[in-house]
Every structure is written in C-alpha cells, then in structure tokens.
Amino acid sequence: MKQLVLASGNAGKLGELRAMLAGVALQITAQSEFGVQDVPETGLTFIENALIKARHACLMTGFPALADDSGLIVDALGGAPGLYSARYAGTPTDAAANNAKLLEMLRDVPVGRRSARFYAVIVLLRHAEDPQPLIADGCWEGEIVFEPCGSGGFGYNPIFFDPLYGMTAAQMGAELKNKISHRARALEQLRDCLHTFMA
C-alpha cells in the first residue's frame, strides 16, 4: 500500500478524505504525524495555496502529498470570506468566531440573497518538483442560514444550508455529506486517476 501525506493537520479533513477514498490502496497520513507544521498560505488563489501546501508536505516527508484549499464564497459579501475562510475572524482559527462574524456581516441580508458555495481545489504531487500535478476542483451550492443548526462536521457546516436536502451541512450524516460536498466532488475527479498517478 502506497503512502500518501495529507498536507494538513485538520482531523476533520483527514477523516473525510479517508472515508471518501476508502477502497483505494493508499495509506493516508496527516503531515502532523511526521512532525510537519502548516506552511503559510501566501497564494492569491485556491490553486496556488493547495500547490504551496502539497509541495511543502512532499519536501518535508519525501512522500507524495495531497493538499486542498477550500473556502466559503458568499455572493452578498463579494466572495468573502473566500481565501480567508479559516481565518475570517482572525487567528488562531476559531470556527465559532468565523460563523458569528459571517452571520453578523449578513445580518441585514434577506432570504433569497444569501447564496453561497463551498469551493475546493485538491492537488496531488508525486514529489516536491512534480511538473505535472493532478488538480481537481469541486463546488457545493447552498445558502447561509440565520443561525447555526446541527452538530456534525466542522467549520461553516452549521450555517451552510443545502436547499436540495433541506438541511445544513452540520445536520447531514457523514455518508451523505461525503457524497455531495465540494471536497467529495473534487475527489471524485481524482479517484479514477489515482491508481495510474501513484504507480
């Protein structure tokens, strides 16, 4: 079984990725298990940040690395929090504070004008200088509710509502979320290529 490093120490992401890639012959380990710290996200796009993280993980561990950069894009806020989703309320990152700030920013925005989407880019590098990274992206359309609802998931899940399913991401079971999320959609693009890419 091939080793693949997740360029993140986020336990929620690691669990999601392991569940979504079940059946693929990969041992997925968080970079934190190798003592690798997060690298500053200095890119100006989701793709740049994912590449920065994947290269850093490859360089520090010597293994192929998978990195994602994702965020919540809210139309009424001109795309914010976007690239700064994890640090929207400042650092250190705090999901509850991020959610509270976002809800405050949308306080006067009525139903019907609270459209949003989760967007994810996933990058897979065989080595730090891989000239041909595998890149996929995924989008999950929804809207922002007026108050948090549900206890599952992480990040903005309690305030991101999927009208098709009539619930927030935090109210969904992991099985459903792992089929329809932005990250799941990006990983679905990668799944078929993983066997060849890792050979």
UniProtKB/Swiss-Prot annotation:
This is dITP/XTP pyrophosphatase. Transmembrane segments: none annotated. Its cofactor is Mg(2+). Gene3D superfamilies: 3.90.950.10. HAMAP family: Non_canon_purine_NTPase. It comes from Xylella fastidiosa (strain 9a5c). Binds 1 Mg(2+) ion per subunit. The active site is at D69 (proton acceptor). It comes from the Bacteria. Its EC number is 3.6.1.66. Pfam families: Ham1p_like. Belongs to the HAM1 NTPase family. Mg(2+) binds at D69. PANTHER family: INOSINE TRIPHOSPHATE PYROPHOSPHATASE (PTHR11067:SF9), INOSINE TRIPHOSPHATE PYROPHOSPHATASE/HAM1 PROTEIN (PTHR11067). It catalyses: XTP + H2O = XMP + diphosphate + H(+); dITP + H2O = dIMP + diphosphate + H(+); ITP + H2O = IMP + diphosphate + H(+).
